[in-house]
């Protein structure tokens, strides 16, 4: 029986990939406050390595990164784990259209606090009740 049938024991694993360590720490703290298990990687290669060894349900990847950009990471993630949902983030508005076709959703970093949780819930097929208020 899959653990997802026992919600009291199931905490989905999310993987955040961003070259900005401060952003990664904020994402991790925010998502863990809502019960997610969060893995982080500071570049695409490390993220792909983590995804190959963990049952990651959702990948949240920044578009603008050195070495491998978010589109390249998403393409390789699709090959590695086709069942994994991918959300692309960017602080800029000039993400190429073809990059958006590789992912399941896009969230602007300026809307992270209000859009990330509903986007994750929608992709996972969860009831889209408003998330509980975050208490710091």
In which residue ranges do the predicted regions lie?
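Active-site beta3 strand of CheY-like receiver
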Residues: 54-60
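Acidic catalytic/metal-coordinating carboxylates
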Residues: 42-46, 69-73
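Receiver (REC) domain active-site loop signature in two-component systems and cognate sites
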Residues: 65
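Short hydrophobic/Thr-rich beta-strand motif most characteristic of the beta2 strand and flanking loop
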Residues: 35-42, 50
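Non-catalytic signal-transmission and effector/linker regions of two-component phosphorelay proteins
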Residues: 1-13, 112-136
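Conserved phosphotransfer cores of two-component systems
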Residues: 52-54, 76-84, 101
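Conserved acidic segment of CheY-like receiver
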Residues: 10-22, 27-31, 59
